[in-house]
Amino acid sequence: MTVVRPTGDDLVAMLAALANPLRLRIVATLAGGPDYVSHLAREIGVSRPLLHMHLQRLEVAGLIVGHLELSDDGKAMKFYNVADFDLHLNATVLAEAAKTLTKSDPEKGSAAKEKP
């Protein structure tokens, strides 16, 4: 089995997406199987617009995948499922990922990537 390690930017996006309790609940719910937006919103107890915002963030981070399916009455329904990922973190993985960061550190400002 080939181990693929995320780049620093991918790792930051994934961890930032999972740092939100609601997004963590969304991933946990979808781990049980694919679900469509309206049902998922009712299941989790949030509005569809709020759910859409969080689903987009998770999709951009590569943690979930969305696809359209037609219902029996011909209505398009957006389903989401968990993407195939297996994330293992330790100091070595973090150090390797940090070497590949392309985005500046917001805490250090735009000068973070500049060399003297």
Regions found by a protein language model. Give the residues of each.
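Conserved segment of winged-helix/HTH DNA-binding domains
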Residues: 72-116
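Beta-hairpin "wing" of winged helix-turn-helix
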Residues: 60-73
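Residues within the DNA-recognition helix of helix-turn-helix
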Residues: 54
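Short, charged/polar surface micro-motifs in flexible loops or helix N-caps
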Residues: 33, 57, 85-88
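Long, low-complexity, charged/polar intrinsically disordered regions in eukaryotic proteins
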Residues: 1-7
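N-terminal helix-turn-helix DNA-binding core of bacterial DNA-binding proteins
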Residues: 10-50, 69, 76-81
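Alpha-helical residues within the helix-turn-helix
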Residues: 42, 59-60
